[in-house]
């Protein structure tokens, strides 16, 4: 969400939308942002392959294809363990050239991370760490999306709260 990004990063952020913009416009918008940055991060929407209807039109996958961007997939691991390998394999092989290069495991137990890391590596992915489950750590949502950054109580503390990295 651009409001969260702007607040956390203390900079203006933008939007790339393949539903409303053609490929050239998307590449031009990204190139303008890249000129003034050392790194550019594109946050995906919904499920990685989810677009209009039962297609990839307007999906994060489509943006990755248009921009030739490597993808770091965030996988919700709450309630799963060994199935994480199947989830990763499914995402990386569902479409040819998925662009998925790395993974961050969300809501993962520290004890399970070594096995998840190995599963990712066996698929040629770079495991970039995990975020442990924290009671009260999830951001609230409502119909049509998350609450705004200004509505989150203790925003800075919650965003800064412990996460494990493996860089």
Residue ranges of predicted features:
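Conserved beta-strand segments of the P-loop GTPase G domain that flank and frequently precede/overlap
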Residues: 73-76, 104-106
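Internal gly/pro-rich beta-alpha loop/helix module
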Residues: 82-167
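ATP-dependent carboxylate-amine ligase catalytic core
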Residues: 1-67, 75-99, 111-114
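Short hydrophobic alpha-helical runs that function as membrane-insertion/retention elements
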Residues: 71-74, 128-130
């Amino acid at each position: 969400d651009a409001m969260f990004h702007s607040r956390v990063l203390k900079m203006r952020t933008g939007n790339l939308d393949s539903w409303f913009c053609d490929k050239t416009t998307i590449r031009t918008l990204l190139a303008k942002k890249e000129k003034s940055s050392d790194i550019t991060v594109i946050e995906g929407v919904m499920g990685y392959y989810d677009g209009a209807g039962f297609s990839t039109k307007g999906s994060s996958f489509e943006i990755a294809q248009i921009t030739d961007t490597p993808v770091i997939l965030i996988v919700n691991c709450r309630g799963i363990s060994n199935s994480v390998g199947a989830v990763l394999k499914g995402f990386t092989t569902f479409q040819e050239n998925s662009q998925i290069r790395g993974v961050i495991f969300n809501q993962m137990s520290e004890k399970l991370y070594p096995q998840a890391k190995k599963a990712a590596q066996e698929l040629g992915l770079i495991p970039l760490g995990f975020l442990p489950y924290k009671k009260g750590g999830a951001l609230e949502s409502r119909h049509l999306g998350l609450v705004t950054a200004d509505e989150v109580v203790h925003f800075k503390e919650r965003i800064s709260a412990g996460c494990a990295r493996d860089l």
